[in-house]
A protein has these predicted regions:
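Basic- and hydrophobic-enriched, low-structure N-terminal and domain-boundary segments
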Residues: 1-125, 129-135, 142-148, 500-507
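P-loop NTPase motor domains
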Residues: 73, 78, 100-104, 108-419, ...
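Alpha-helix capping/termination and helix-coil
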Residues: 374, 378, 382, 403-406, ...
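Conserved P-loop NTPase motor module
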Residues: 310, 475-555
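Short regulatory helix/loop adjacent to the ATP-binding pocket of P-loop NTPases
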Residues: 166-170, 431-446
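Conserved P-loop NTPase catalytic core
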Residues: 438-479, 483
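Switch/connector loops and helix/strand junctions flanking conserved nucleotide-binding motifs
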Residues: 162-165, 187-192, 430-434, 460-465
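Conserved H-loop
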Residues: 424-430
């Protein structure tokens, strides 16, 4: 800014006064006592020209400094945002976070991005508009025109408005054709159970993990374990009679309708007699028959109904609504979204659009299943040479709605698979309320190295942040005033005490106390909207700790 002002003034000065510097003489016209006087004497011009140049340079430096400082104060954020927007599309993958207190631009390089982000803040603190939206925008825009480098993303939206911004960001950089919106009665169909490459036990365990979302106290372990076993055996049967294609509708029928079960067993028995089953299928068939006929259907009616109700907490959503069934239990030939392999290989953007206030637990089920599918596919990259090394990202607003215990394992290992995890939640307590296990919450928090704290009233969050920033010696000063009197009388007229021969003393005590760098008032009162405390890494070391003014997406 200073250089621009300085050289502008220099060029202007040259254009206006060039003729004077090239002349050999100058005539002065001076008004003195209202008498016009024109001297004919030619003064020495070399000294005059040299003096004028020196004076101009000095005045130009002073003026340029004043102008540039005023402009910097008026538009610091605008200028930095312009730089952010231009640099965000550079060849290097990095995220611009905001401005430090010294107005320096803070960014995180690619190696630091793979150590994940945890963003917390109370409602209205600006965590979505100044952190989640800008970060999402930058990741979508990265190498948007390069089919080999653009990122593949999974974005979960349980409020129903995030995907609108995603579509806007994608359209602005020409990636609108990369968007896959998963929503009821939408253009894409998705079957969470169509995973032919996974064993039935793995799929059943994923379903149990999702069931835990509806068991906040985790007090139903026995029923959940039994439900997992029943689901595993039902998936085995369904794969055998339904050409290796499993849906929630088929699982629901096998579990709740004993006549439907016998019908399918009869069909498989016929195939067995015709020698159309492989050895693996015969083993799975015998295992399923033994479980259902000797354990499941042999239970007393009350126990059986409890176990059925545990399983149908998931399956009922898919059989009771036509639009839901059409979208998430389609026939194989109508299946349009077949998983995250293409997302990773081609750089697609998958967005879930299901408002949790409208779809309740169904939104949690689909969100959690998309997340688990994405995590499984990402980790498969480590064991396969067929995958590209394209970076991918998982972005989740209101993460506490579908946090699962297995997430900590993924966050700890996803760095090697080049996955950027950015999650947002109101507080650590909201995660604790969902998992009901403080140690599991602490492990998840530990594996999200980059932390951004907006204004918060949550004690758990504040205390954890204070410990993260550490302590330092603080000087505490206390003033004490005292008054002593030899004789004090009470005045009944003025209702006051009158002292005689009194003296006043003052003492000042200074002490050093080892205390937190940021006290609780800083988190609850001092932090402004769109400002945050950050703990950031570049992948090798912690590079920045302190206050940052964020970049709201609308500025």
């Amino acid at each position: 800014m200073f250089s621009l002002c300085f050289f502008t003034a220099l060029i202007t000065y040259y254009l206006y006064f060039n003729d004077i510097y090239l002349s050999n003489s100058i005539n002065f016209i001076i008004f003195n006592n209202s008498i016009l006087f024109t001297p004919t004497t030619t003064i020495s011009l070399n000294d005059l020209k040299l003096l004028s140049i020196v004076l101009f340079i000095l005045s130009d430096i002073i003026t340029s400094n004043i102008i540039s400082s005023k402009l910097t104060k008026l538009i610091p954020h605008h200028a930095k945002t312009k730089k952010q927007k231009s640099d965000a599309t550079s060849d290097s993958l990095e995220l611009y976070i905001g401005n430090s207190e010294a107005n320096d631009l803070i960014k995180i390089p690619e190696s630091g991005l793979y150590q994940n982000f945890l963003i917390t803040g109370s409602i209205g603190s600006g965590k979505t508009s100044s952190a989640m939206y800008p970060f999402t925008k930058q990741l979508i825009e990265y190498s948007s025109s390069d089919s080999a480098k653009k990122l593949g993303l999974l974005i979960l939206d349980v409020k129903g408005n995030y995907y609108l911004k995603v579509k806007e960001f994608a359209q602005n950089c020409g990636r609108q054709n990369d968007i896959i919106v998963i929503e009821p009665n939408g253009p894409y169909t998705y079957n969470p159970l169509d995973k032919p490459n996974l064993k039935p036990s793995v799929i059943a365990n994923q379903l149990k993990t999702i069931l835990l979302l509806f068991s906040p106290n985790n007090s139903e372990a026995y029923w959940l374990d039994k439900a997992e076993t029943a689901l595993c055996e039902a998936i085995k049967l369904c794969r055998m009679y339904n050409n290796n294609y499993v849906t929630f509708v088929e699982i629901h029928k096998l579990i709740t309708d004993i006549n439907y079960y016998h019908e399918k067993i009869k069909l498989l028995h016929s195939r067995f007699l015709d020698n159309k089953l492989s050895k693996v299928e015969i083993y799975d068939l015998l295992s399923a028959i033994k479980f259902f006929e000797q354990e499941f259907f042999a239970l007393d009616l009350r126990t059986l109904n409890i176990l059925k109700s545990e399983i149908t907490r998931i399956t009922n959503f898919f059989v009771s609504d036509y639009e839901i069934s059409k979208t998430f239990c389609p026939p194989r030939e109508n299946l349009s979204f077949k998983g995250f392999y293409d997302v990773i290989q081609s750089g697609k953007i998958v967005v879930l659009n299901m408002n949790i206030s409208k779809y309740k637990n169904l939104s949690k089920i689909i969100s959690a299943y998309l997340k688990l599918d994405f995590q499984t596919e990402v980790m498969s990259r480590l064991a396969s040479d067929s995958y590209s090394d394209r970076p991918v990202a998982f972005i989740s607003d209101e993460y506490s709605e579908y946090v699962t215990l297995t997430d900590s394992n993924f966050f700890s290992q996803s760095r090697e698979a080049k996955c950027i995890n950015i999650i947002s939640t109101q507080s650590y307590t909201s995660l604790l309320n969902a998992l009901n296990n403080k140690y599991s919450v602490e492990v998840i928090i530990q594996n999200l190295v980059n932390k951004i704290w907006f204004r918060s009233d949550d004690i758990f969050t504040i205390e954890s942040a204070q410990k993260q920033f550490g302590k330092k010696d603080r000087t505490h000063i206390s003033h004490t005033f005292s008054e002593n009197a030899k004789q004090t009388n009470y005045n009944f007229i003025t209702h006051s005490l009158n002292s005689k021969d009194s003296n006043i003393s003052e003492s000042i005590n200074t002490s050093t106390q080892f205390d937190y760098i940021y006290d609780s008032n800083f988190f609850t009162k001092t932090l402004k909207t769109f400002s945050s405390l950050c703990f950031l890494t570049d992948g090798n070391k912690i590079t920045y700790t302190g206050l940052i003014n964020m970049f709201p997406y609308f500025k």
